[in-house]
């Protein structure tokens, strides 16, 4: 399996509720490498591009309003199978359908306040990483325990 990268964002509700360390810890404990991290309040333009696939849906403006309502923690994680694994760590979009042990299953309240976003596939990951990060904001590094993470 080859290394891949995925985009993950802790949404304003997760930031306001003090869940940043809890969420970061789950990805680090799993063994993924954090290669990009920043805190920002997204602009309306960034939010509309990010959620562009939903632009004709009735909930689009609510998504944009919410994600721009406060700070977001934008991250890029790297590892073998990180896209699919991140989706499993995150859990179902609707928290009531998310399994216990997942981020949403343990921490999210409802679909409108589901704490976290993660890319749903490789094409989406590339698009979202390039939308939220400049290349020089991503750090290529090797953790000292790398030999203990993968063969």
Curated annotation (Swiss-Prot):
Keyword Nucleus recorded: no
The keyword Magnesium appears for this protein: yes
Reactions catalysed: a 2'-deoxyribonucleoside 5'-diphosphate + ATP = a 2'-deoxyribonucleoside 5'-triphosphate + ADP; a ribonucleoside 5'-diphosphate + ATP = a ribonucleoside 5'-triphosphate + ADP
Cofactor: Mg(2+)
Superkingdom as given in the UniProt entry: Bacteria
Annotated Gene Ontology cellular component terms: cytoplasm
Stretches of the chain forming a coiled coil according to its record: none
EC number: 2.7.4.6
Binding residues annotated for ATP, in chain numbering: 11, 59, 87, 93, 104, 114
Keywords: ATP-binding, Cytoplasm, Kinase, Magnesium, Metal-binding, Nucleotide metabolism, Nucleotide-binding, Phosphoprotein, Transferase
GO biological process: CTP biosynthetic process; GTP biosynthetic process; UTP biosynthetic process
Compartment(s) of residence: Cytoplasm
GO MF annotations, alphabetized: ATP binding; metal ion binding; nucleoside diphosphate kinase activity
Annotated signal peptide: none
InterPro entries tied to this protein: NDK-like_dom (IPR034907), NDK-like_dom_sf (IPR036850), Nucleoside_diP_kinase (IPR001564)
Catalytic residues, chain numbering: 117 (pros-phosphohistidine intermediate)
Main location: cytoplasm
Functional note: Major role in the synthesis of nucleoside triphosphates other than ATP. The ATP gamma phosphate is transferred to the NDP beta phosphate via a ping-pong mechanism, using a phosphorylated active-site intermediate.
UniProt subunit comment: Homotetramer.
HAMAP family documented for this protein: NDP_kinase
Family indicated by similarity: Belongs to the NDK family.
Protein name: Nucleoside diphosphate kinase
Species whose genome carries this gene: Prochlorococcus marinus (strain NATL2A)
Annotated gene: ndk
């Amino acid at each position: 399996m080859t290394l891949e990268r995925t985009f993950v964002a802790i949404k304003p509700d997760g930031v306001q509720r003090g869940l940043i360390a809890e969420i970061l810890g789950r990805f680090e404990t799993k063994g993924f490498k954090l290669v990009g991290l920043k805190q920002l309040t997204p602009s309306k333009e960034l939010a509309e591009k990010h959620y562009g696939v939903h632009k004709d849906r009735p909930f689009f403006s609510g998504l944009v309003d919410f994600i721009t309502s406060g700070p977001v923690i934008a991250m890029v994680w790297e590892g073998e199978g990180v896209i699919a694994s991140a989706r499993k760590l995150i859990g179902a979009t609707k928290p009531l359908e998310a399994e216990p042990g997942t981020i949403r299953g343990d921490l999210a309240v409802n679909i409108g306040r589901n704490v976290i976003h993660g890319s749903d596939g490789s094409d989406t990951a590339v698009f979202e990483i390039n939308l939220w990060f400049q290349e020089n904001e991503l750090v290529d590094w090797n953790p000292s325990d790398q030999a203990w993470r993968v063969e």
